[in-house]
Amino acid sequence: MAAIKDENNDHLVQSDNPEHPSNLIPALCRNFYSHGWVTGTGGGASIKRDNHIFIAPSGVQKELIQPHDIFVLQYPTPKYPPSARQYIRKPLELKPSACTPLFLAAFDRGAGCCIHTHSQWAVLVTLLVEREKGPEGCFEISNIEQIKGIPRGKGKGMLGFFDTLKIPIIENTAFEEDLTSSLEEAMEKYPDTYAVLVRRHGIYVWGDDVAKAKTQCESLDYLFQLAVEMHKLGLPWVKS
């Protein structure tokens, strides 16, 4: 049994440290489930530590994930084809996350953690933006205190109360991995963004580390919910 474990590099996901990625990912997923962000096996999370990428599996109840369920990739690794990705630790009978190439796109930009949720508020704002601005519109909001929880850009500090937060929106596809090119195009068009919305689907949020990715995700979800409620009251998202 020990030889099998060594062969599968199980030691990579075994740690008593609560800050180890294999322990953080299950904890994050339980937290996200309580918010309704990863309902019905949706969503995911990934953490980069040194030259390893730790990823939650696909198609499982995220609130039940355990450390031994975590995949580990060698980084850097090719996004495509999936067979070229260098997994150095694979749980038996579980599928790698379909979000993997999108997570890798965030890590290629220097992220330390990337989160994908199916937040209902995120989905709703993508529909409202489409109706009000058309398919090319992005989500914008200003003069809300919680905006201060979002970075202005890499190394540029945080947004201020009077700044306008802009989050690009891309169209959904039948298969998760097919979102990668659109996500990367949005990253190029909005180089200071730390999130990309996916219409009728959810959002990808990344940060320099786990804490920043988590708090940015929370701040954005707060802003999306607020935006939906503001829309009901006929209040503009961007103050004139």
UniProtKB/Swiss-Prot annotation:
It is found in: Cytoplasm. Keywords: Amino-acid biosynthesis, Cytoplasm, Lyase, Metal-binding, Methionine biosynthesis, Zinc. The active site is at 145 (proton donor/acceptor). InterPro entries: Aldolase_II/adducin_N, Aldolase_II/adducin_N_sf, MethylthioRu-1-P_deHdtase_MtnB, Salvage_MtnB_euk. One of its GO terms (cellular component) is cytoplasm. Its EC number is 4.2.1.109. Disulfide bonds: none annotated. Substrate binds at residue 99. Binds 1 zinc ion per subunit. Pathway: Amino-acid biosynthesis; L-methionine biosynthesis via salvage pathway; L-methionine from S-methyl-5-thio-alpha-D-ribose 1-phosphate: step 2/6. Its cofactor is Zn(2+). Zn(2+) binds at residues 116, 118, 201. It holds the Pfam family Aldolase_II. GO terms for molecular function: methylthioribulose 1-phosphate dehydratase activity; zinc ion binding. It is an enzyme of class 4 (lyase). It catalyses: 5-(methylsulfanyl)-D-ribulose 1-phosphate = 5-methylsulfanyl-2,3-dioxopentyl phosphate + H2O. One of its GO terms (biological process) is L-methionine salvage from methylthioadenosine. Catalyzes the dehydration of methylthioribulose-1-phosphate (MTRu-1-P) into 2,3-diketo-5-methylthiopentyl-1-phosphate (DK-MTP-1-P). Belongs to the aldolase class II family. MtnB subfamily. This is Methylthioribulose-1-phosphate dehydratase.
